[in-house]
Amino acid sequence: MSKADLIIGSQWGDEGKGKIVDMLCANYDYVCRSGGGHNAGHTIWVDGVRYAMHLVPSGILHENIINIIGNGVVVNPDVLIAEMAQFKNLKGRFFISEKAHLNLEHHSLIDQAKERAKGDKAIGTTGKGIGPAYADKVNRTGHRVGELLNPEKLCENLMKEFDENAKFYDALNIKIPEKIAVFNELKRFKEFLAPYIANTTEMLWKALDENKKVLVEGAQGSLLDIDHGTYPYVTSSNTVASGACTGLGLAPKDIGEVIGIVKAYTTRVGNGAFPSEANDEWGEKMCQIGKEFGTTTGRKRRCGWFDAVCVKYSARLSGIDKFALMKLDVLDGFEKVKICTAYKLNGEIIDYFPCNLESVEPVYEEMDGWDSIKGVKKFSDLPENAQKYIKRIEELTNMRAGFISTSPERDDTIIL
């Protein structure tokens, strides 16, 4: 019996998980998504071509791999259908859990209306309806992908719920759709998606029993976890390693190696605490060189120095075995680089991740920078200062480096 390996974002998302998943895919039979929705963007560069995916697992670029969207994902059928249209011959190699919840148009309208109402206190969601879809799931009023197989019944249930909540929608200035429009849309969803809806939990159990190799592609980052992240500025699902179990129907003993993905610096989209944020020329330089604009929203990402305290916390939460250091080349040419090694909280130096992260000040260690590393494929060929930087990150986070990315291209990666 085999185990499922995990790739987990260890910061606030956008770490570069897609590249590592794509690089490792050839060694696996299955690639799965276990949580999140189309708020998460996966970007892969192959032969200079950029592929941006939001729901479909990154393994879809390999025709011999079976790709699964698990029950923990909230699925927007419109987005999924448009994304699937980019790829050929999906039947038999792409499946959606019948238990995954639907993220429909009214969810995004609610999301956007609530964010507008909060004004300057807005969380900074993507406005894609992820939170409202998960809220319906927890409230036991949501609808699942399997219900698309009976669009007549699903339409009746949705219209009944719209009527029951008419005052709520009116207060948010959201117009309730006509029944015929809802039915026609659900019918279209069924016609396109029905061949791909399956009992993916049983499928994965059988795969592991048959010693197939399974890779789970995490969405977003550990610091956005609904329980362990910088609440309330978080996402609506569990993004740490344990979320893969509930999001796919796996047992803890089914989990094998856990690989954490970290950038050589730190980024964050939206509001919330960010101790090592660099609101200066260096942060702007990271943003421009690293092309730090969201795959999903196009929003400019906030940039800052590597935060070893945050990453050490993420590593412990997910039991990370080794990490992949991404975008090291973005720091090429920096005369000095910094690492946040601790925090100052109420005058005291701490080395742990507190609940009130917004109250801390960063404590930095400064190191000498390096010249270009772009395209380097051997650790020994890296400049000495770049090697020192990596080793210092290993020491501070209690993890070992397994991969070092030296450019966006798939092959420009040092494997240790």
Curated annotation (Swiss-Prot):
It catalyses: IMP + L-aspartate + GTP = N(6)-(1,2-dicarboxyethyl)-AMP + GDP + phosphate + 2 H(+). GO terms for cellular component: cytoplasm. Substrate binds at T295, T296, T297, G298, R299, K300, R301. It comes from the Bacteria. Pathway: Purine metabolism; AMP biosynthesis via de novo pathway; AMP from IMP: step 1/2. GO terms for biological process: 'de novo' AMP biosynthetic process; IMP metabolic process. GO terms for molecular function: adenylosuccinate synthase activity; GTP binding; magnesium ion binding. The keyword GTP-binding applies. IMP binds at D14, E15, G16, K17, N39, A40, G41, H42, T126, R140, Q220, T235, R299. Binds 1 Mg(2+) ion per subunit. Its main location: cytoplasm. The active site is at D14 (proton acceptor), H42 (proton donor). Its EC number is 6.3.4.4. GTP binds at residues 13-19, 41-43, 301, 327-329, 405-407. SMART domains: Adenylsucc_synt. Keywords: Cytoplasm, GTP-binding, Ligase, Magnesium, Metal-binding, Nucleotide-binding, Purine biosynthesis. Its cofactor is Mg(2+). Belongs to the adenylosuccinate synthetase family. Homodimer. Plays an important role in the de novo pathway of purine nucleotide biosynthesis. Catalyzes the first committed step in the biosynthesis of AMP from IMP. This is Adenylosuccinate synthetase. It comes from Campylobacter hominis (strain ATCC BAA-381 / DSM 21671 / CCUG 45161 / LMG 19568 / NCTC 13146 / CH001A).
